[in-house]
């Protein structure tokens, strides 16, 4: 399945049942991740340090357990700091694909990447999202159904994830789309771009454990040992994602643990 996607997704998307049309925009948009403000967390850290120094001066051992608990809670916040990423492309159900060309130009100018290669890599990512969304519609019998139909509404609810599943759904969707993008870059000979894509997500993972794109690392590591194994794992994730975001997410966590 993955081979078929990569072979046609740029040159012949219609063979995958995808529309060739998509939109471009010069707007600069950012997506925010994380929960805690960096300045506030830094301030809290300085306050904890002052309390620690005061306890050391007073030899107040009884206060240490409470301080240790506060430190543990503060440490967790360090891994959930807010940060923003510039959007290069976006897929929205019912609206289609938009590529943010000004953002792509800005990224290429900053890092010296080939514009056409980066542009097409973003298009690969967003078209995989669209292909995935269409597969969900088919699974729920909603392909071609009216937006008022029960099947369509059920598929929409599933696609976005129900409450606590939403974060897991995001990880699964981005893992499938970004691994396809990364592998496309490799196959097209854009090695520096492929490395940059992976490095960006590894750096973000250090700041926020549930950064959705970070799930791609496990598949990339598996690919390094066996292309066939990575392709099988990708197909397995795709099928799992049509019935259970939780099961697909659990499989991604397993892959990340092995890498």
Regions found by a protein language model. Name each.
Residues 117, 133-174:
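Post-HEXXH active-site segment of zinc metalloproteases
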Residues 121-137, 178:
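Active-site recognition of the HExxH zinc-binding catalytic motif
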Residues 1-115, 239, 243-250:
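A metal-dependent hydrolase signature that marks the N-terminal structural subdomain at the beginning
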